[in-house]
A protein has these predicted regions:
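N-terminal hydrophobic/helix-forming segments and targeting peptides
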Residues: 1-432
Length: 432
């Protein structure tokens, strides 16, 4: 399992690459790609997927019988990074890229490390326009720190100005431009690149640490760890799922900036797909409402582990540790969707599968973050639980997590898809 996770992390250098990696796994498992603009003819027992913007994916398998509910797991494909605004600019004998921040990253962690560029380019062809993945697979850039001799108090704290401190060094004056290198990598003329969505990419490869390799470090663990492990669980359970419910796996873009895009969790994307699935299979007039009432969803986004150097930042009543199992997240202000009902259901599933579960709550004096589950509730009024894998250094250029937790997440999600869950009434369920 860990090797699969490493593959996903290495290949998914941007949201566009994450979607392409997921697509390759789905295709290898026999799933068929559908375009949103096409007519959908679905066959019982078959698996399908669709993409939006090349950065969000929804996959599902049609059950052999009428759809009586949905089993959904959702994660996100994006991570904090630096979006490239313009090609290289020259000043003081150097070429630099012009970038702006995407999401709430720890800025200092991007300094003094090898970086490169990835994303997509829109290329002019004989027939029109084509989207191509871009990844310049070599150490290419750096954001250099200012020497301590010019800022003697740097170790007492520094407020980073992204316009001043975080612009990456490209090369000497007169060097080839970014557009030149992208065109060369794609085998096209620079003039044929009509536009692009490009960002900086951390070059560090995933690596295991600890006396026995218990932990691993990698860029983009939030949230590609959940994206990869939930997809592994989805594929592992394929063909063994609840015969009355359709298993669905989703990965959305733009969670780190609010999810409000057409490919984000706050859009109608997932609801659109579910509605179209029902339209393509025989169903009654009330099928959609009945299916929603008998559905359940997991929002999978990583969680904060209790930091050994800063234990006071965590709720002492709910310590979270690396290797402690899948994290179930609660928040009184509904930033997380878990309540007593959905929490009990998830705990029961994990107990049956022998998967450890730990609880995350914020300190009462900390607002904390949110994720995609509560936003998805706007369009999908079904019971949900927020889960994740524990990690350190969330939104750093390189983060740290547990190998055992990744295995636990995969196992828990596979068990979730396999379980026969029935809503007997509001708050009453059977599990088989």
């Amino acid at each position: 399992m860990y090797d699969d996770l490493v593959e996903f992390l290495q290949e998914s250098v941007t949201p566009f690459h994450a979607a392409a990696t997921a697509e390759s796994w789905l295709c290898a498992a026999g799933f068929t790609r559908l375009e949103e603009a096409d007519y959908w003819n679905l066959e019982p027992g078959k698996g399908y997927y669709t993409t939006r913007n090349g950065s969000s994916v929804v996959a599902w398998r049609v059950p052999q019988h009428a759809i009586g509910g949905w089993r959904i797991v959702a994660s996100h494909s994006d991570s904090p990074s630096w979006k490239i605004k313009a090609d290289t600019v020259e000043n003081d004998g150097c070429r630099r890229l012009s970038v702006e921040g995407y999401g709430g990253m720890i800025m200092s962690t991007w300094l003094d490390r090898p970086l490169t560029v990835g994303g997509r380019a829109l290329v002019k062809t004989e027939d029109g326009i084509e989207s191509r993945l871009v990844y310049l697979d070599r150490d290419l850039l750096v954001i250099p720190s200012l020497a301590i001799h010019f800022q003697r108090d740097i170790n007492k704290g520094h407020t980073y100005n992204p316009q001043v401190d975080m612009q990456p060094l490209w090369g000497p004056a007169g060097s080839r431009t970014l557009t030149d290198l992208v065109a060369e990598s794609l085998g096209v003329e620079a003039a044929d690149i009509l536009d692009s969505d490009l960002q900086l990419v951390t070059r560090q490869a995933p690596t295991q640490i600890g006396p026995d390799g218990e932990f691993f470090m990698a860029p983009r663990i939030d949230d590609l760890e959940c994206a990869a492990t939930t997809l592994l669980g989805f594929l592992d359970a394929s063909g063994e799922t609840d015969s009355a419910c359709a298993p669905v796996w989703a990965m959305f873009d733009n969670e780190e900036v609010g999810s409000s895009s057409r490919m984000g969790a706050a859009s109608s994307y997932l609801r659109d797909v579910l509605d179209r699935i029902l339209e393509a299979v025989p169903h009654s007039a009330q099928a959609s409402h009945r299916a929603m009432a008998n559905s359940f969803m997991l929002s999978a986004d990583n969680a904060h582990a209790t930091h050994p150097n800063f234990p006071q930042k965590s709720d002492p009543c709910a310590p979270v540790r690396l290797g402690g199992g899948v994290v179930l997240k609660y928040n009184a202000s509904q930033k997380y969707t878990t309540n007593a009902v959905s929490g009990a259901i998830f705990r029961a599933i994990c107990q049956k599968a022998d998967v450890p579960v730990q609880v995350f709550t914020n300190r009462a004096d900390e607002a904390g973050g949110s994720t995609l589950g509560n936003l998805q509730s706007h369009t999908l009024p079904i019971p949900m639980a927020d889960i994740g894998c524990a990690q350190f250094a969330m939104h750093s250029a390189v983060e740290t997590a547990s190998v055992a937790d990744a295995e636990a997440m995969t196992k828990a999600v596979a068990a979730f898809y396999r379980v026969h869950l029935r809503a007997l009434g509001d708050g009453t369920y059977t599990l088989e």
